[in-house]
Swiss-Prot record:
GO biological process: endonucleolytic cleavage in 5'-ETS of tricistronic rRNA transcript (SSU-rRNA, 5.8S rRNA, LSU-rRNA); endonucleolytic cleavage to generate mature 5'-end of SSU-rRNA from (SSU-rRNA, 5.8S rRNA, LSU-rRNA); ribosomal small subunit biogenesis
InterPro entries: G-protein_beta_WD-40_rep, Utp13_C, WD40/YVTN_repeat-like_dom_sf, WD40_repeat_CS, WD40_repeat_dom_sf, WD40_rpt
SMART domains: WD40
Modified residues (Phosphoserine): 257
Role of this protein: Part of the small subunit (SSU) processome, first precursor of the small eukaryotic ribosomal subunit. During the assembly of the SSU processome in the nucleolus, many ribosome biogenesis factors, an RNA chaperone and ribosomal proteins associate with the nascent pre-rRNA and work in concert to generate RNA folding, modifications, rearrangements and cleavage as well as targeted degradation of pre-ribosomal RNA by the RNA exosome.
Protein name stated in the entry: Transducin beta-like protein 3
Organism: Bos taurus (Bovine)
Linked residues for Glycyl lysine isopeptide (Lys-Gly) (interchain with G-Cter in SUMO2): 407
Residues that span the membrane, as ranges: none
GO-annotated molecular function: U3 snoRNA binding
Record localization: Nucleus, Nucleolus
GO cellular-component term (any): nucleolus
Amino acid sequence: MAEVAAGVGRFKSNYAVERKIEPFYKGGKVQLDQTGQHLFCVCGTRVNILDVASGAVLRSLEQEDQEDITAFDLSPDDKVLVTASRALLLAQWAWQEGSVTRLWKAIHTAPVATMAFDPTSTLLATGGCDGAVRVWDVVRCYGTHHFRGSPGVVHLVAFHPDPARLLLFSSAADTSIRVWSLQERSCLAVLTAHYSAVTSLTFSADGHTMLSSGRDKICVIWDLRSLQATRTVPVFESVEAAVLLPEEPAPELGVKSAGLHFLTAGDQGALRVWEAASGRCVHAQQRLRGPGRELTHCTLAHAAGLLLSVTADHNLLLYDARSLRLRKQFAGYSEEVLDVRFLGPEDSHVVVASNSPCLKVFDLQTSACQILHGHTDIVLALDVFRKGRLFASCAKDQSIRVWRMNKSGEVACVAQGSGHTHSVGTICCSRLKETFLVTGSQDCTVKLWPLPEALLSKGTGHEGGPVFLQAQATQHCHDKDINSVAVAPNDKLLATGSQDRTAKLWALPRCQLLGTFSGHRRGLWCVQFSPMDQVLATASADGTIKLWALQDFSCLKTFEGHDASVLKVAFVSRGTQLLSSGSDGLLKLWTIKNNECVRTLDAHEDKVWGLHCSRLDDRALTGASDSRVVLWKDVTEAEQAEEQAKREEQVVKQQELDNLLHEKRYLRALGLAISLDRPHTVLTVIQAIRRDPESCEKLETTVLQLRRDQKEALLRFCVTWNTNSRHCHEAQAVLGVLLRHEAPDELLTYDGVRASLEGLLPYTERHFQRLSRMLQAATFLDFLWHNMKLPALPTAPAAL
């Protein structure tokens, strides 16, 4: 524990992204492979391939044109994937390698809306927004058929399951189903029974029966031998997909007799099983209230025994096909993330509130996702109790809910409460014990909700349903929306922050006003108590963070640095630093003592609404309007250890370099200096070589024995030396060796040689001119010396 405390108390200097939870499905088609191990789905310009077991994105396929994907299909043999983009290009992929094997024009005059393979994985049919249907041979790489006659967008194509019959079915805006013969290259029949768009076509195993579904709330059974409708089944909902079930008993689905049964998915948000002969619904899932629950897609993987359904809010649900037991849940797109929290005693899970009534709980180890239903409108805020298993949520539906995660990681609602008259925008849990909740609302009031002891003593999942909470105290606190509430570490104080530009301090449990913090120029988004000192932090839309003293309500410090609203603030490093997030998508780390912004982190592209720190203070979690949830890891100690190791390595190498120079082992000394990537050190070695009596030969021998990458580095260093007249001689000496012994063609293949030559030429010319002038001056001095010699003095006469 002492080590943990010491680690928490150190100043942090940097965070690094540990992992991201990003959107992988934004609507459109989804498809399982035959084994049920891979899931293919569209996300804008990419087709993402998910590993069903782990939930991780294995590969993202994006066409060269980088346009939105409008349609795709996987061949029945799971070998070929074809995608169509808005640029009217078709791409054939070897998806397991992630490579494009063929790219060709769709020849449609408008984007491709749908496509489907035939059972042999040889033919591909494409339906376009131009009303045309085309058939392609993907093995021989040519177009085989072009069918016209469909009015409007062709949004559905399907091949007959018997490849010998060579029949293609399509449906367009006229609500009819057209049957095309590939042999006769003509339309055999137009099947009319629907009065609204046909949404799916599926075939029986023997190929004699076809089921069609539509938004006209009916499903039609067709006899493909006579091409006539044999039965119309009213299903009382707009159907987006229908699936024929295998003709075998499935008691858990209500299939107890032989005969044709099918499953529908539609706007009621529940899967239902129907008996075709009687038109009865023999099994139905429980319906869930709230928007976004409508089912938009459903597909069956027969070999894997899996059924996949997709909801309107982009959640993917994987069921056991024989029992409809839920196996997996995937959150494809979270839209705008409004709040995030670590969950579990060891912060092993993450709970996310997005622009949806559903909560999403992710296991950080396995990436498994749970989707929690309960609220009927958008969830706005979250908070977690001290032990980590119990957490609370509040929403626009004016209610709050309490959830508990059991030891196996399953989460269930254990309590709910209502009483506010407007959206509940903020919630905070008690800090010492799991005893109460505090909520703030757009009705300008704060409510205190005690948790009954019976709730705390019971396990997860009450047989009688969630416990109903009653508010113990209600207080009108501000004149505008309350954006944030915070409970002090001792559970005796409450802070509120509002759009009225003030924060207020209250005494619990009676909510008595103690004082007001005034000073911000715009509304407050967040208030937080320091875990160590009697200090309150406030974050405002004016782009500042302020620290306030609880004793006299004075402003102690103001932190400026965000260019936009500061949305969240949290204390880290035992209250000595702050972590803040803003609407500019940035995360900032501050040291309180000197008002310094230590680090600015950028991993989001929009407003960062959610910010939470782990129990050990070594990780942080952020969620933003760009649909991303980012997990950050404190890398301060790792970076410090890395820097220390680098310094020690530099000292050792410097000592080794000095020893090599002393021993006149120039080749190894030069190689070591180059590996250090220090031009001045390399210059020192070159100067030592040139001081040797046999400098020319030794320099030439040493340079020529270097590897090519070392010569490239040496050439770059020469550019730096050549800019200084004191070091240009060493640069020119090295350059002379290279030019004399390396062929021009070889030199031109060096990495960065052109940039090096551009840097060498002007300074070399300048040095040449300077030396030429010096040579002229020296020659002139020599000339003057020879011409200014004094004549010989006359010899003195001999003495008489």
